[in-house]
C-alpha cells in the first residue's frame, strides 16, 4: 500500500471551515407583505400583514380574509405620531377583500381602553350599565354598551348614590336615546357618531334632571356584520360548474 507524503492529503469537503457557524435564515424572507387599508378615516393605511408564500402562483386571499386588527383613534386621524391625540377609543377592523397588495377592511366594532373604564368607577357613586342591540341600514346587528356614573349632587354629602327607581329611568332614557340616534343609520354614520362625544353628552343632558351622570359608550360589538359575510355565487361553486358543463355537452 502506497503511503502519501505529509501535506498531500485532499480534504473531502473543501468549502467547510472549522469554527464558522452557519448563517441563520431570515424567517420573513419568504413572506409576502400586504397593506392593511380602510376608507372610514382620513388615514387609510394602518400597517402591514404577511403570510408565508409556499408556491410562486399561490392565491393567498383565503388566508388573509377574516383577519382582524385594532387601531387607536388618534392614529386614524393624524399621520404624524408626534402630533396624534392619545384617544381612549380603539376601532376594530376586519379584512373582507384583497386587491393587489392591499387588504381592504371594514368596521368591526369599537372598544375603550381598560384604563379609561376603570377610571370612571368611583367610590360612593353608582355605576349604571346598559347594553342596546341596534340594526344598521345594511342589515348588520350591533350591541352598544354604555356605562354611566353618578356625579356629585349635594356638595356637602360624601355619598352620591342613586335610587333604584332613578337607575331604571336613567337606563330607560339611555336606551331610548341610543335607538333614536343609532338604529337604522348607515355604518359610516355610526363610525362618525362613535368617534365623538356627542351621544354621551346627549345622555348626560337628558338624565341630568333625574340625577347628574357622566356617561360613555365603552364598547360596540358586532353580532351580525353583513359586510364580512361572503356570498358564494353560482360561478364559484364547483358543483354548479360541473352540472353546467354536462348540460352544455348534452345540448350539443
UniProtKB/Swiss-Prot annotation:
GO biological process: translation
Main location: cytoplasm
Classification via InterPro entries: Ribosomal_eS1 (IPR001593), Ribosomal_eS1_euk (IPR027500)
Pfam families named among the record's database cross-references: Ribosomal_S3Ae (PF01015)
Annotated localization: Cytoplasm
Annotated keywords: Cytoplasm, Ribonucleoprotein, Ribosomal protein
UniProt keyword annotation of Transmembrane present: no
GO CC annotation: cytosolic small ribosomal subunit
One MF term in the entry's GO annotations: structural constituent of ribosome
Subunit organization: Component of the small ribosomal subunit. Mature ribosomes consist of a small (40S) and a large (60S) subunit. The 40S subunit contains about 33 different proteins and 1 molecule of RNA (18S). The 60S subunit contains about 49 different proteins and 3 molecules of RNA (25S, 5.8S and 5S).
PANTHER family: 40S RIBOSOMAL PROTEIN S3A (PTHR11830)
Membership in a protein family: Belongs to the eukaryotic ribosomal protein eS1 family.
Protein name: Small ribosomal subunit protein eS1
The species this protein was found in: Enterocytozoon bieneusi (strain H348)
Lineage: Eukaryota, Fungi, Fungi incertae sedis, Microsporidia, Enterocytozoonidae
Amino acid at each position: 500500500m502506497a503511503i502519501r507524503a505529509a501535506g498531500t492529503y485532499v480534504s473531502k469537503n473543501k468549502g467547510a471551515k472549522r469554527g464558522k457557524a452557519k448563517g441563520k435564515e431570515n424567517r420573513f424572507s419568504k413572506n409576502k407583505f400586504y397593506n392593511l387599508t380602510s376608507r372610514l378615516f382620513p388615514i387609510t393605511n394602518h400597517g402591514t400583514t404577511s403570510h408565508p408564500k409556499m408556491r410562486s402562483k399561490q392565491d393567498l386571499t383565503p388566508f388573509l380574509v377574516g383577519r382582524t386588527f385594532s387601531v387607536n383613534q388618534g392614529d386614524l386621524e393624524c399621520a404624524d405620531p408626534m402630533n396624534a391625540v392619545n384617544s381612549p377609543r380603539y376601532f376594530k377592523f376586519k379584512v373582507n377583500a384583497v386587491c393587489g397588495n392591499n387588504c381592504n377592511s371594514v368596521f368591526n366594532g369599537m372598544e375603550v381602553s381598560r384604563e379609561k373604564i376603570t377610571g370612571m368607577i368611583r367610590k360612593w357613586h353608582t355605576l349604571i350599565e346598559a347594553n342596546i342591540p341596534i340594526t344598521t341600514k345594511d342589515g348588520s346587528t350591533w350591541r352598544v354598551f354604555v356605562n354611566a356614573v353618578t356625579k356629585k349632587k349635594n356638595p356637602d354629602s360624601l355619598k352620591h348614590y342613586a335610587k333604584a327607581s332613578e337607575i331604571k329611568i336613567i337606563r330607560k332614557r339611555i336606551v331610548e336615546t341610543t335607538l333614536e340616534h343609532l338604529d337604522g343609520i348607515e355604518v359610516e354614520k355610526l363610525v362618525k357618531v362613535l368617534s365623538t362625544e356627542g351621544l354621551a353628552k346627549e345622555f348626560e343632558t337628558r338624565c341630568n334632571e333625574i340625577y347628574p351622570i357622566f356617561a360613555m359608550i365603552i364598547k360596540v360589538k358586532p353580532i351580525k356584520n353583513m359586510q364580512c359575510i361572503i356570498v358564494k355565487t353560482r360561478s364559484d361553486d364547483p358543483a354548479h360548474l360541473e352540472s353546467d358543463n354536462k348540460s352544455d355537452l348534452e345540448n350539443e
